[in-house]
């Protein structure tokens, strides 16, 4: 699949700047009590969730293609950070790409959250790196640093440097994602938000798989499951008795 994209490095900086601007405005205007976003991870190929309550800490917020955690998980009930000293729910601002927005809607449908207490900082997600694939190709070599340069992922370690094209090493789900920004539910979103998202079904990947021979399908399945020792062991064990279908 060919992915049309701009300069990912520049896009990341623009998205990060907008996140900081919107977060700062929400805190300054007392529209929210806390911002949930992403900050730099403690190890390469990672990011970490962060809770920001002071305008002075907004610069800790980052956006890069390693922001894989679904922040909607942190809006689950009974998380102490989201309540004040009197047990009242805080007003929350949350950095939301498309998949985070969809997760929030699901929580709202289950009556676990109320959009009256939530303000989404909407962004147009430009894709998340397939960490597992990169780690597999790097092997046992220790990764010390990762960065985006133009449209390439740069991975550095002791005595090595590898370059991976971003469009090829993006998560497969990101490649086919049609809703990159969150929906604007009852005016709960600022920034990049979708008013009436319309998604067209696209099953090209399924058609491609169905067109493969039995041997090609089997090779694809084994490669896909190779990152999970238990899964691939189960599949290979079954093949001993039944053989590939």
Language-model features, listed with the residues they occupy:
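Iron-sulfur-associated redox domains of electron-transfer enzymes in respiratory
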Residues: 1-217, 241
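Long, well-ordered mid-to-C-terminal structural blocks that present hydrophobic/aromatic surfaces
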Residues: 215-245
